[in-house]
């Protein structure tokens, strides 16, 4: 298959998937999730391959969804990352949460092909892995970062929820909350200290370290790798990973269509996505004046 958003190559027992939209910092478009899943399937069906390395072309690993295209454009289902047609006679301003869920859950499961792959997956994170890009990286079995690279989910501040929900399963409740209640980015050193990623090394040593671990894994028989991975993943399945992802995907759609989400969408249309992001992440109150009371009714008996 000819891929438009990534490159796929095999060298000995190692398959490499390279996200290949460097001019957009490998931002996710509508094609990329399915192409990731297709490349993972190619590797799983290739008897020569024992391990898969995922990386990005250019300066970034993945900057998340290509929201400049979606956030700055006015149109149907405002705020939706998916857009989509509107039936004749329907209100074009209406948001269909189940249509949104259908598309975003499909993307999430395509990212999760990295987690469910029968062959181990290693994310080589040399540059920013943010928003949806962090979702992709954290779906891999192992994540090795450059110390200088950053990872995080800034849309947790407004307009998003991490649909793969891997933060809590990697960090535990308190550290996951610390990251998602702030939307902060952390560098590779801090990510490794927190236990979010396996390790961080200087950028100049990243290729050698990834190759070292990949080659060590690749020496193991494929059936042994498959058994160990299925056993570990089963523990996470038993903890409710799939249900948490469904919940997170629903919340992601809601976040994009909340009063604050619509504020962000309007700001992106007015001043451009980059400026809207600067306002979101600048440290001041987010979406001033947009929020509604969380408790709109008085207390009983009050």
Show which residues each predicted segment covers.
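Conserved CoA-thioester-binding segment of acyl-CoA-metabolizing enzymes
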Residues: 1-57, 71
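C-terminal alpha-helix plus adjacent terminal tail
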Residues: 1-12, 79, 187-188, 208, ...
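Terminal peptide-recognition signature
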Residues: 17, 21, 35-36, 54, ...
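A short, glycine- and basic residue-enriched loop/turn
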Residues: 22-25, 59, 148-150, 185
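Charged catalytic carboxylate motif
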Residues: 31-35, 106, 113, 209, ...
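Glycine- (often His-adjacent) and acidic-residue-rich active-site loop
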Residues: 56-113, 275
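Short, active-site-adjacent cap segments at secondary-structure transitions
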Residues: 59-63, 130, 232-235
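Crotonase-fold acyl-CoA enzyme core
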Residues: 112-225
């Amino acid at each position: 298959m000819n891929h438009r958003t990534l490159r796929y190559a095999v060298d000995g027992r190692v398959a490499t998937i390279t996200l290949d939209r460097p001019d957009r910092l490998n931002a996710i478009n509508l094609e990329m999730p399915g192409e990731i899943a297709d490349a993972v399937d190619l590797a799983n069906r290739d008897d020569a391959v024992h391990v898969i390395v995922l990386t990005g072309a250019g300066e970034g690993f993945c900057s998340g969804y290509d929201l400049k295209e979606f956030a700055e454009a006015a149109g149907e289902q405002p705020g939706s990352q998916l857009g989509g047609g509107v039936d004749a006679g329907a209100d074009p301003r209406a948001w269909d949460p189940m249509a949104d869920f259908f598309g975003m859950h499909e993307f999430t499961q395509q990212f999760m092909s990295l987690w469910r792959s029968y062959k181990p997956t290693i994310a080589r994170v040399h540059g920013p892995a943010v928003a949806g890009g962090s979702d992709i990286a954290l779906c891999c079995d192992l994540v090795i970062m450059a110390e200088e690279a950053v990872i995080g989910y800034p849309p947790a501040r407004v307009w998003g929820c991490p649909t793969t929900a891997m933060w809590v399963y990697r960090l535990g409740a308190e550290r996951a909350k610390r990251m998602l209640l702030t939307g902060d980015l952390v560098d590779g050193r801090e990510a490794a200290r927190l236990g979010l990623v396996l390790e961080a090394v200087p950028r100049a040593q990243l290729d050698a370290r990834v190759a070292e671990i990949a080659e060590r894994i690749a020496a193991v028989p494929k059936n042994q790798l498959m058994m160990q991975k299925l056993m570990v993943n089963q523990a996470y399945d038993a903890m409710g990973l799939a249900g948490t992802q469904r919940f997170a995907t629903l919340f992601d759609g809601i976040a994009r269509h909340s009063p604050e989400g619509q504020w962000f969408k309007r700001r992106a249309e007015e001043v451009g996505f980059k400026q809207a992001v600067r306002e979101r992440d600048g440290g001041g109150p987010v979406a001033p004046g947009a929020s509604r009371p969380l408790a709109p009714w008085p207390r009983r008996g009050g």
